[in-house]
Every structure is written in structure tokens, then in C-alpha cells.
Amino acid sequence: VEAIASGADLVAQSTHKSVGSLTQTSWLLGQGDKINQRRITQMHQMLQSTSPNYIFLASLDMARHQLATEGKALISRTVELSLYLRHELNKISGITTMEYIDIQERVVNYDCTKVLIDAKALGLTGIEFERMLREYRIEVELVQAHHVLVLITIGDTKESVTSLIQAVQAISDTILHTSKVANSNVVENAENLSKDSSLLPKPIVRVTPRNAMYANREQVPLRDALHRIAGETIAYYPPGIPCVAVGEEISSSVLQYIENRKALGYVPNGADDMSLETIWVLPVSYTHLR
């Protein structure tokens, strides 16, 4: 069910992921009388470049035209490929995909073109599964404790979907043949780490982002950063939301979140030290600000 058809006022659609426009492009769709178009335009003008990229705009228009003239056939074929992929993956030992029946009591519907592949029964964490798929030249959309998400789009073909099926089959065969299925405790631990770090308390802002950005900083071991003021913003994807932003106090919850993510194999965005053995903080004098 389309968001607009469901009555949404504003919808951001990432056309570059599923429709075929160039990377970085998307649409903001709106309907109804609740939208202040003048306000939206004002905000848009504040954020956008004064020199828009007309190649990007042209790609959006081409994507729009393609949907208008071929959309029904393209989407139907994409859905068929997605269902075929799900059917074939569920035949593979140690592999399952999340289906509507698994979540129907909690949702109105689901997008079958977003295929969540679970490798828990093979003893793989999501990060390990992602790395193994990369050896077959397959990139996934995102990873979590023990699964990966792949997107099937109008650009996919029977050949590309078959390549994914064959890669997953090969990974399953390799693990089961060599009896390298990890101890169930490993995956269970990954699940627990993911759950434990899913929610963080409301951050405490000690210094405004602007003042913090221009303040002197020092680099300290992560273990010594408790209650210090962050001098850099740290985020993991997923969810793509900072666990601590510049100017915020680094709490014990944040430190635990970072340690959990490190244990799962995630690489942070925004960190100067990608290993996060160290972190930039403001001088101790800022710590006493209340």
C-alpha cells in the first residue's frame, strides 16, 4: 500500500534505491490542505544548493516518465522476482526470510521487495554474513544481529537474483560441509547485544553544537570518556542516528552502546578513530558545566 494512498500528508521516497534515478536523488510528495507549501519551499531554499545539479533533476524526471509509461509492468516483475527469491532462499539449509505471516499481527502490510535474510541457524552474525556475501560481489542494504537486508528493484533481473541465491547456497554448503557452525551462544550473544543497545536515554546537552565544534579538544581512551563532553559525533548504521553528538555528555549507556556495537563488528560513522579505542572530547573544564 502506497503511503500517499494511505492518506499521508508528506512522503519522502528514495527513488535512487528502487526506481532508477541517480544516487542522492529522491522525491518529496505531498497532498491535502495540511501542507504549508510556502514553508516547505522556504526550508528547501535554505538547505539546497543555489546551483542545482540538472543531471540529477533529469534523472528524476526520467524515472518519473518510466514509472508513468512502464511502471505497472516493472513493479509487477520486481514483485515476482522478490517472491521467487524468497521461495528459493527458504529452501536453503540454515536460511529463512521474514514473511508477512511472521509479523501480520503487528503491521498493516509489508514490502516484499525488501528481503530480510536470517542466517542464525548457520551460526552467523549479520556482520559475518555480510562479509561472506561480499566475497561473491554482493552488497547488502544493512545488517543487524544475525540477518541482512537486500532490496530487489526494477533494475534487478532473474540473473542477478539467481546470483544471490547461488551465493547464499554456497555459504550454507561451505559452513555445513565443514561443520563450522558457530556455537549458538555466539549468535545469542549477538542478539542480546543488539537488543541491549537498541534504546538510549535522552542525551544531556552540555554545550551547544556550535560552541562544541569550535572548542579545543583532546583525544582520550574511550574507557576514560565517561561524563566527558563529546568533541565529535558518533553514529552507527543502522540506525544512522548518532549515539552521541558533539556537545553531549558521554554517559555510561553511550559507552556500553559503543562497546556492544564494536563487539558485533560495526564500524562507526563520524569517528576520527574508526576503531573507537579513543574519542575526541572537550577539556575537563567543560564537564562541570550544568
Briefly describe each language-model feature range:
Residues 1-94, 98-99, 119:
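Conserved PLP-enzyme active-site core in the AAT-like
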Residues 6, 21, 35-38, 51, ...:
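Conserved active-site and cofactor/substrate-binding residues in soluble primary-metabolism enzymes
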Residues 17-18, 33-35, 62, 120-122, ...:
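Short, glycine-/Ser/Thr-/acidic-enriched flexible segments
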Residues 37-41, 59-68, 108-113, 142-148, ...:
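Short acidic (Asp/Glu) and glycine-rich catalytic loops that position anionic groups and cofactors
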Residues 73-149, 154, 176-203:
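Conserved small-domain helix->loop->beta segment predominantly found in fold-type I
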Residues 132-135, 141-285:
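PLP-dependent enzyme catalytic core of the Aspartate aminotransferase-like
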Residues 287-290:
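Conserved small/polar residues in nucleotide/adenosyl-binding loops
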